[in-house]
């Protein structure tokens, strides 16, 4: 379901895929070729949520903010199943593993990988191209070329799947 909040209307690129049973409300911007998967909730009723190009937000994720603290996802970000993102910044090509939580004013560096089930506390900065894991998340190591290749594959596959599902939606209309 997509609807405004007060005077703010979601802005969704025509090429983006929005799965059924997804809720998007308020001051939300979703970029080209992004995909928002089943049962996810993106609320822009407190501050803006800005989602770049080729971002995938997987099933059952929740994106929200605190007053005056936007939520920003740069291009080609992967957000795993059941992730909570709250007023944080996720830099380009980062991957947030399934079931992770990233809290207010945390920043995930470009190309960083947050391991499944991690908690990134308020204000924590994760450096670019590192693997961070745990509750609270701690940097474990630098990413290997194989890690980076795998992250790129996941992002690419979700972009392709999103376009496939979008074509199915068009056929149903």
Task: For every predicted segment, state its role.
Residues 1-15, 124-130, 135-173:
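Terminal amphipathic alpha-helical/low-complexity segments used for targeting or macromolecular assembly
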């Amino acid at each position: 379901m997509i609807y405004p909040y007060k005077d703010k209307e979601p802005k969704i690129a025509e090429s983006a895929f929005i799965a059924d049973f997804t809720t998007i409300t308020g001051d939300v911007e979703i970029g080209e070729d992004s995909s928002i998967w089943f049962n996810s909730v993106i609320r822009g009723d407190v501050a803006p949520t800005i989602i770049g190009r080729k971002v995938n937000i997987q099933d059952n994720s929740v994106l929200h903010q605190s007053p005056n603290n936007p939520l920003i996802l740069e291009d080609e970000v992967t957000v795993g199943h059941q992730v909570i993102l709250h007023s944080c910044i996720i830099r380009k090509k980062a991957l947030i593993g399934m079931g992770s939580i990233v809290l207010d004013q945390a920043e995930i560096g470009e190309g960083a990988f947050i391991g499944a089930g991690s908690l990134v506390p308020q204000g924590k900065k994760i450096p670019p191209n590192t693997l961070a894991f745990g509750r609270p998340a701690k940097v474990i190591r630098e990413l290997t070329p194989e890690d980076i290749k795998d992250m790129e594959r996941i992002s690419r596959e979700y972009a392709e799947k999103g376009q496939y599902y979008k074509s199915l939606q068009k056929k149903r209309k």
